[in-house]
């Protein structure tokens, strides 16, 4: 008795949820976004549903012809049957798109715009280059470091010949 009740409950639930959902006050239909969707992908060559859901009368007669011998079908009918089930063929899926051109164009545009912003900042935002970047100042700084004998063991002053006043060879 308990098993019969459980089976009838499961059966009622399966029937009621397959077509529509029953709410407290009426019948709620299944929304379209909850149903399986059609996607053409190389990784999943057989989608869950057919591409064309609502068949025209010609397509319905073609589906009836499909149940018979395929030798009786012409090539155009076979292609039409294929297009009912699939939107694209593998050749069409594998065909490259020209989307890369717009991506590269967008990247080059933003790189160019960034370059213009950097040039504008150098001219109008930043001040003059400090005097410490001048080659004359750098030469004086180098001579001062050598005179102070900075890091004489392994570093800078170790490569300077103090007797001949030139770099060691």
UniProtKB/Swiss-Prot annotation:
Signal peptide: none annotated. GO terms for biological process: mitochondrial electron transport, cytochrome c to oxygen. Residues 23-98 are mitochondrial matrix. SUPFAM superfamilies: Mitochondrial cytochrome c oxidase subunit IV. GO terms for cellular component: mitochondrial inner membrane; respiratory chain complex IV. It is found in: Mitochondrion inner membrane. Residues 125-169 are mitochondrial intermembrane. The chain crosses the membrane at residues 99-124. It comes from the Eukaryota. Residues 1-22 form a transit peptide. It is a single-pass membrane protein. Pathway: Energy metabolism; oxidative phosphorylation. Its main location: mitochondrion. CDD domains: Cyt_c_Oxidase_IV. Keywords: Membrane, Mitochondrion, Mitochondrion inner membrane, Transit peptide, Transmembrane, Transmembrane helix. Pfam families: COX4. InterPro entries: Cyt_c_oxidase_su4 (IPR013288), Cyt_c_oxidase_su4_fam (IPR004203), Cyt_c_oxidase_su4_sf (IPR036639). Component of the cytochrome c oxidase, the last enzyme in the mitochondrial electron transport chain which drives oxidative phosphorylation. The respiratory chain contains 3 multisubunit complexes succinate dehydrogenase (complex II, CII), ubiquinol-cytochrome c oxidoreductase (cytochrome b-c1 complex, complex III, CIII) and cytochrome c oxidase (complex IV, CIV), that cooperate to transfer electrons derived from NADH and succinate to molecular oxygen, creating an electrochemical gradient over the inner membrane that drives transmembrane transport and the ATP synthase. Belongs to the cytochrome c oxidase IV family. Component of the cytochrome c oxidase (complex IV, CIV), a multisubunit enzyme composed of 14 subunits. The complex is composed of a catalytic core of 3 subunits MT-CO1, MT-CO2 and MT-CO3, encoded in the mitochondrial DNA, and 11 supernumerary subunits COX4I, COX5A, COX5B, COX6A, COX6B, COX6C, COX7A, COX7B, COX7C, COX8 and NDUFA4, which are encoded in the nuclear genome. This is Cytochrome c oxidase subunit 4 isoform 1, mitochondrial. The lineage of its organism: Eukaryota, Metazoa, Chordata, Craniata, Vertebrata.
């Amino acid at each position: 008795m308990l098993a019969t009740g459980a089976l009838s409950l499961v059966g009622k639930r399966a029937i009621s949820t397959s077509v529509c959902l029953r709410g407290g006050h009426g019948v709620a239909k299944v929304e379209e976004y909850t149903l399986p969707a059609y996607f053409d992908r190389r990784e999943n060559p057989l989608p869950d549903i057919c591409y064309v859901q609502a068949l025209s009368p010609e397509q319905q007669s073609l589906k009836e012809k499909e149940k018979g011998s395929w030798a009786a079908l012409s090539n155009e009918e076979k292609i039409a049957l294929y297009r009912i089930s699939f939107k694209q063929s593998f050749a069409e899926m594998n065909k490259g798109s020209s989307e890369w051109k717009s991506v590269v164009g967008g990247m080059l545009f933003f790189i160019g715009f960034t370059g213009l912003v950097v040039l504008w900042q150098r001219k109008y935002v930043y001040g003059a280059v400090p005097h410490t970047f001048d080659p004359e100042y750098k030469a004086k700084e180098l001579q001062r470091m050598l005179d102070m004998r900075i890091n004489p063991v392994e570093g800078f002053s170790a490569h300077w010949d103090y007797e001949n006043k030139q770099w060691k060879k």
